[in-house]
Regions:
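Short helix-initiation/N-cap motifs at beta->coil->alpha
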Residues: 70-80, 238-249, 260
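Extracytoplasmic/periplasmic substrate-recognition and gating elements
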Residues: 267-335
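Conserved N-terminal structural module of periplasmic/extracytoplasmic solute-binding proteins
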Residues: 14-101, 404-415
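Extracytoplasmic/periplasmic solute-binding protein
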Residues: 137-143, 149, 167-222, 252-254
Length: 415
């Protein structure tokens, strides 16, 4: 009964959002909001809050905004906040893109309507919009789009042609006495490689966020080719399983490395630092870029904590929209190197000429959005890769292995 009440309340305030033209009442009241975000970014975010207040004032808004900062990071907000109706629950909060299914099920995501949905359509179309879509509607505001990995390498060893394909990369490394690191034993890398030739999963939900069905076709022709690609890479003598920045003593000279380590890779290779999109792989005459996840972070608006106060709920939407807007995303890039997903922010002169941004934008064209991921997708591929490593999975029984993998994925609940 309590859950039913929560969703009826969310539906009510959603109607209010559309009916009131999506603008807080201009009566000069004080609106209190709680914001949950990364502890280390508190000072930066509080500066953005002041920018938001100034922008609201310039727009003729007479309200006063008091914003309390809760140090709850985007990777743990779903498990840290136990009661989304509590007075200290966040109105607006940061979350990793793969948390959307969990938060939707908790009723912690307000559906976007009116100008807020138009904001997503106008500036986040494509990748960003995909990250915040559930059951055909938008439920959050994306504000980053750079949680991925791609090739980071030593240009004194590899040329532009070498890094175009994984075969060329591995062969060149072997010829020069070096190694290529690709962390296939970890699901974020290895599981995503299964997307290479077009195999995928899909999850359908009911209106309460419960999983209705998980579908997957990794046991089909596309999945089989991806499995063979993983097998081929792991059998190459130049391949090693790693994703970290190699030490000066290491023989690794190319890594499928995370965007969070860009600065460290640059420090390691200096002027010889190079970067490129995921290399291609060829199986049975078919050539595709190796699959990868591309995730990001979004700002969720919690409709439960406002308890029917439409001014507070709309103010939360206004804050979330501002913090995911062009100016805020540009400032994150300028201060932290965090790549934006806002279409206009991407056109900033410093980004257009940034090699890492160029690679990221190209990779986003074929990378797999990291949204709600079936739970077993984080474990089943690990079993598969482990079988290749220990020799129990060979080309002779690889179809049987991916049949088992696929059955594990569709039989598990989504996270």
């Amino acid at each position: 009964m309590k859950k039913l009440f929560v969703f009826l309340m969310i539906a009510f305030v959603g109607v209010v959002l559309v009916a009131c033209d999506n603008t807080p009442k201009n009566e000069g009241k004080t609106i209190y909001l709680n914001y949950a975000g990364t502890a280390s970014d508190k000072g930066f975010n509080e500066g953005l809050f002041e920018d938001f207040k100034a922008a609201r004032k310039a727009a003729g808004d007479k309200n006063t905004y008091v914003i309390e900062y809760l140090e709850i990071g985007p990777d743990v907000v779903d498990s840290t906040v136990l009661d989304w109706t509590a007075p200290n629950a966040p109105d607006v909060y940061e979350a990793a893109s793969d948390k959307i299914g969990i938060l939707y099920q908790k009723g912690a995501l307000a559906k976007l309507g009116g100008k807020y949905a138009e904001f997503i359509d106008n500036y986040m179309a494509g990748f960003g919009a995909t990250l915040v879509t559930m059951n055909g509607s938008y439920y959050a505001y994306p504000y980053t789009g750079d949680n991925t990995y791609y090739l980071q390498y030593d240009k004194s060893v590899f040329g532009e042609e070498d890094v175009k394909s994984i075969e060329g990369l591995l062969d060149k490394a072997e010829a020069e006495g070096y190694k290529v690191a690709y962390n296939l034993e970890t699901a974020f890398w290895g599981a995503a490689a299964l997307f290479t030739f077009g195999a995928d999963y899909s999850t359908s939900y009911d209106e309460d966020g419960n999983v209705i069905e998980i579908k997957a076709n990794f046991n089909g022709a596309e999945g089989l080719k991806a499995a063979k690609a993983i097998y081929k890479i792991m059998q190459h003598p130049a391949w090693v399983n790693d994703s970290g920045v190699p030490s000066a003593e290491s023989d690794v000279r190319a890594t499928i490395g995370g965007t969070w380590d860009i600065a460290n890779f640059k420090n390691r290779y200096g002027e010889d630092y190079g970067c490129a999109v995921m290399p291609t792989v060829t199986v049975d005459g078919d050539t595709k870029h190796l699959g990868c996840f591309v995730g990001g972070k979004f700002l969720g608006v919690n409709p439960q904590v406002s308890k029917g106060d439409s001014d507070r709920l709309v103010a939360a939407h206004e804050l979330a929209m501002y913090l995911s807007g062009k100016e805020a995303q540009t400032k994150r890039y300028e201060n932290f190197g965090i790549a934006p997903c806002h279409s206009e922010a991407k056109q900033h002169p410093s980004m257009v000429n940034d090699p890492n941004m160029i690679v990221l934008n190209e990779q986003a064209k074929f990378g797999h959005p990291q949204d709600a991921v079936p739970a077993a997708f984080w474990s089943a591929p690990g079993t598969f890769v482990g079988g290749i490593k220990d020799g129990t999975i060979t080309l002779e029984n690889i179809q049987e292995a991916i049949d088992t993998l696929n059955n594990s994925i569709i039989g598990a609940p989504a996270e």
